[in-house]
């Protein structure tokens, strides 16, 4: 009874807060970085079927992606190789669509369970395709030469990306490899000891496919990565949009996103034209280390991604307030921390649906 009354009060407070937020958008403070994180990107597979993918982004959506300080995405595909034979679960890229992912603020994560679909030959060709399209990447490397990727070279303190996976060693080597979890952990420790003020973003390809909840392995290693000094930890592999949280007991109040889901995912025809495709927007206060996040909602139509027209400042605060309200009454946040399904227009229906499901 008490919990039902508390929940009713939280919903009323949330609706009232939403109306106040709608009346006055909140501007981002100076010194705050925005990191856009996309899940699995597979520029091949079903995208090559008629009608083939054309433009991946409309001009307004592309402009929004360019406005972020950093745009990260998981490159879940191999390059062409002599063993290339496309099927339902093995994918190889010809590289034709890659120039459309060449954002000046962007970087691809190349440690996952598909980068070695073409063995070392395919991995080498993927690296060549990325470099030819002027896309920075971290993950694949010549054995013994791994280095964190500096995302904002002119900025102090520096921001680095480190990428690894417990599942990307199959088919690797002998020369081209990715980091395993123990190697990734040591890389975080080494970087933190060398640059104590740096911001460390860690991407790991891990999780249980088809499940939005974090796996035991994810939680175990997230705690270890956080203790080693990671500021932000991003997971993808499950193909689901998971929750996100701050590990309050960690030394740097590490932010963790448990599942980035799919983005431009040519591995499944269902993502050709889909009404709910998301990006995670993370804001990092470089002065205080504070972090917040919200989902940005969009859709695909014949593989072209476009964002819905929503007031992002409202969306951000509603999702943050919802997560805190759920914590007050001892319940986990609504799955995915947001809408069940994005809708067109200004997204108010989805915001009210969020409160209804709280």
Where are these regions (language model features)?
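Bacterial N-terminal signal peptides
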Residues: 13-23
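N-terminal catalytic scaffold of extracellular/periplasmic and nuclease hydrolases
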Residues: 29-120, 126, 137, 200
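Active-site-proximal segments of metal-dependent phosphoesterases and phosphodiesterases across multiple
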Residues: 82-100, 198-230
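Short acidic, glycine-rich surface-loop motifs adjacent to enzyme active sites
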Residues: 68-80, 188-213
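Active-site environment of divalent metal-dependent phosphoester hydrolases
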Residues: 44-46, 79-82, 111-127, 143-149, ...
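A short C-terminal boundary segment appended to hydrolase-like catalytic domains
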Residues: 29-32, 42-49, 195, 268-358
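Binuclear metal-dependent hydrolase catalytic cores centered on His/Asp/Glu-rich metal-binding motifs
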Residues: 48-59, 91-92, 150-203, 220, ...
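Conserved beta-sheet core of the metallophosphoesterase superfamily
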Residues: 104-107, 216-278
């Amino acid at each position: 009874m008490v919990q039902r009354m508390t929940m009713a009060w939280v919903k009323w407070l949330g609706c009232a807060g939403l109306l106040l937020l709608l009346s006055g958008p909140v501007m981002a403070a100076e010194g705050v970085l925005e990191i856009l994180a996309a899940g699995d990107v597979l520029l091949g597979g079903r995208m090559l079927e008629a009608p083939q993918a054309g433009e991946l982004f409309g001009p307004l959506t592309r402009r929004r992606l360019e406005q972020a300080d950093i745009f990260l995405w998981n490159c879940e595909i191999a390059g062409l190789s002599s063993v290339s034979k496309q099927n339902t679960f093995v994918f190889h890229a010809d590289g034709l669509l890659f120039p459309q992912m060449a954002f000046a603020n962007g970087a691809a994560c190349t440690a996952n369970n598909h980068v070695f679909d073409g063995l070392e030959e395919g991995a080498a060709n993927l690296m060549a395709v990325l470099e030819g399209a002027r896309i920075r990447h971290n993950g694949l490397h010549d054995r013994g030469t791994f280095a964190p990727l500096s995302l904002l070279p002119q900025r102090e303190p520096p921001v680095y990306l480190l990428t690894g996976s417990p599942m990307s060693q199959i088919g690797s080597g002998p020369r081209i490899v990715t980091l395993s979890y123990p190697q990734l952990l040591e890389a975080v420790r080494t970087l933190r000891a060398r640059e104590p003020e740096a911001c460390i973003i860690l991407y790991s390809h891990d999780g249980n496919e088809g499940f939005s909840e974090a796996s035991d392995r994810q939680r175990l290693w997230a705690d270890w990565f956080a203790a080693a000094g990671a500021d932000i930890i991003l997971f993808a592999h499950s193909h689901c949009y998971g929750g996100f949280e701050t590990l309050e007991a960690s030394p740097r109040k590490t932010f963790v996103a448990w599942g980035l889901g799919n983005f431009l995912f040519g591995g499944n025809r269902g993502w050709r034209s889909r009404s709910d495709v998301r990006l995670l927007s993370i804001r990092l206060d470089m002065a205080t280390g504070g972090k917040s996040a919200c989902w940005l909602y969009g859709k695909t139509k014949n593989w072209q991604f476009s964002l819905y027209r929503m007031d992002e400042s409202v969306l951000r605060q509603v999702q943050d307030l919802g997560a805190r309200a759920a914590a007050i009454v001892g319940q986990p946040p609504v799955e995915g921390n947001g809408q069940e399904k994005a809708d067109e227009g200004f997204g108010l229906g989805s915001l009210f649906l969020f409160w209804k499901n709280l």
